[in-house]
């Protein structure tokens, strides 16, 4: 596509371009704007500068005519004969700060707009903001501010540029991309920031009919579980099927066990086949050898199954892509929701439905956790139980062959028992759908992402391809959509539990660590609780005379477990305190073991211990 054609295309979507004029080979050149640049437009000349086919700073029509003649001569001297099919373009030369806007059809997030410093500095500094083509103005602004160069829009050095103009420009790009669905990649570089606003001076666009997105299928409600079948329930205590069957005994609905050997398990009939089940089932858990799963799903369709949890491994994770694809094709054909394969299972607190082979020590609560790693999930469940954190839902997605993160977030948004969502993410199948779900979510979404190194990228013809498919894009897009990215796995259960915390109190035996912790608390938008005169009076009776009478409550370095206990018994009664940190550093007299035992007690307020040291603690 020639520069003239690109300008016409962009102008149709109201994307500003410089004044320009297309000039025929046999046409006398004339322009009513100067200075101009003149370039050849011909498929015969790819690298214009090498052919001497670009002339700059032309200030009159006479000079324009001379420049055209010189370009023709230069090109012909290179052995290329021009004719009436070739054209020229005269473009008004414009000055301004060089910026970059582009679009990539990312394998995960779909069509995504990129913004950064223009010219050759783009790839050098990789200072890039990422913006979804579906983002609203607020999300666009957050995406733009992901690049440091966006400070230009904050009246930098009194230049008077507003970020509103950049947001308007991005919205025009969004409209252009949606109106031209075959656009697969685009570079606008540079886009000049001028007194008149942003102007796209140079553009390259790649088209691909395969870039058109397909619609997602309408699903049944995965969390609507009334009748459950456990395929592979086993009386062998060493098998996964035994653990799942035992965990499922608390379910408030109907649970059926299936095992080809028959018999009984936990006082319930073991049906020899799916066909023997006394009724239809909406949900099936499958824990049998992988070679039997497809035929089992076939049987389950005759029981009108809507949801299938494939616990069994032996698919993509060991290289059997074909076997996994057969599962995908089958469940899509029959509109079955599939979790897995190769997963830990599923839990729903409201109905005491535990279809996992993890611990049965699970408390009902308001946090939903979705994880691609069963091992990480099992560890989080154990840690949560120890800290009395309950779950509304737990979903181990395993290979995530069918239902993905976006669909689960969308479904959890409609679950009243769920108040917050935490995700352990190794990779995403459909980032675009996830962003849509995140925008609509009325519940906070916390994410820990592993595999942060650059992932595989499709070959690209532009700057854009070198800046996509990485953790920075993942982070930029998700944070702009309102998600909270974490740098600690255990924060997936602790951060949501502390979401409503406002006032924090610190009990410590050392000033330095408490000072560091104070900064940490304040930087995260929490308040350090201010002790009242009455609070101080009560603490005075329990602490040495020289305690600082402020929060952090420094109980002095010689504090032992008895002083920690008296202090905690007092501060847990302070009505406005939401959370208590307890800092312990090793002094000669510090009885660390007794203090640790003390901190494990059931206190009225959440207590988070911080043991600073090594061997002695």
Give, region by region, the residue ranges found by the protein language model.
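Catalytic-core regions of core metabolic enzymes
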Residues: 1-617
